[in-house]
């Protein structure tokens, strides 16, 4: 059962001090993300995608990719995931 706003003594509960009129404004850092951060973020996502596409299309004819075998998927997805995780820091 919900509690009423009046206490057992009959006096009303005190108002909280966190109302919008009592709050002081906080300055938010309005600087955007540096351009190099965005370039690295997009570059990693595209590099991961490119790695997977090249592995799929020509992986058997490229010697070092043939030696890596299934690790190519880990490398490609790893690069793409790092780029995607970087999007959380983008402003």
UniProtKB/Swiss-Prot annotation:
Its main location: membrane. Keywords: Cell cycle, Cell division, Cell membrane, Membrane, Transmembrane, Transmembrane helix. It comes from the Bacteria. The chain crosses the membrane at residues 38-58, 68-88. One of its GO terms (cellular component) is plasma membrane. The keyword S-adenosyl-L-methionine does not apply. GO terms for biological process: cell division. It is found in: Cell membrane. It holds the Pfam family CrgA. It is a multi-pass membrane protein. Residues 1-24 have a biased composition (Polar residues). HAMAP family: CrgA (MF_00631). NCBIfam families: PRK00159.1 (NF001194). Belongs to the CrgA family. This is Cell division protein CrgA. It comes from Corynebacterium aurimucosum (strain ATCC 700975 / DSM 44827 / CIP 107346 / CN-1) (Corynebacterium nigricans). The lineage of its organism: Bacteria, Bacillati, Actinomycetota, Actinomycetes, Mycobacteriales.
């Amino acid at each position: 059962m919900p509690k009423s706003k009046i206490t057992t003594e009959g006096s009303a509960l005190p108002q909280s001090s966190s109302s919008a009129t009592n709050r002081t404004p906080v300055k938010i850092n309005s600087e955007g993300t540096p351009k190099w951060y965005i370039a690295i973020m997009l570059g990693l996502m595209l590099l991961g995608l490119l790695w997977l596409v090249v592995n799929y299309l020509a992986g058997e004819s490229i010697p070092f990719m043939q030696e890596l075998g299934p690790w190519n998927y880990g490398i490609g997805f790893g690069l793409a995931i790092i780029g995607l995780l970087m999007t959380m820091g983008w402003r």
